[in-house]
Amino acid sequence: EGSGSGETSGMWFGPRL
C-alpha cells in the first residue's frame, strides 16, 4: 500500500517507490 506515494503509510517510506 502507498506505492508511488511519499507518505509514511504502510511499508513505503520513499519519495516515489
UniProtKB/Swiss-Prot annotation:
GO terms under biological process: neuropeptide signaling pathway
GO CC field: extracellular region
GO molecular function, one term: neuropeptide hormone activity
Chief location of this protein within or outside the cell: secreted
Subcellular location(s) of the protein: Secreted
Record key words, sorted: Amidation, Neuropeptide, Secreted
InterPro entries: Pyrokinin_CS
Modification type Leucine amide: residues: L17
Top-level taxon of the source organism: Eukaryota
Assigned protein family: Belongs to the pyrokinin family.
Protein function: Myoactive.
Protein name per Swiss-Prot or TrEMBL: Pyrokinin-5
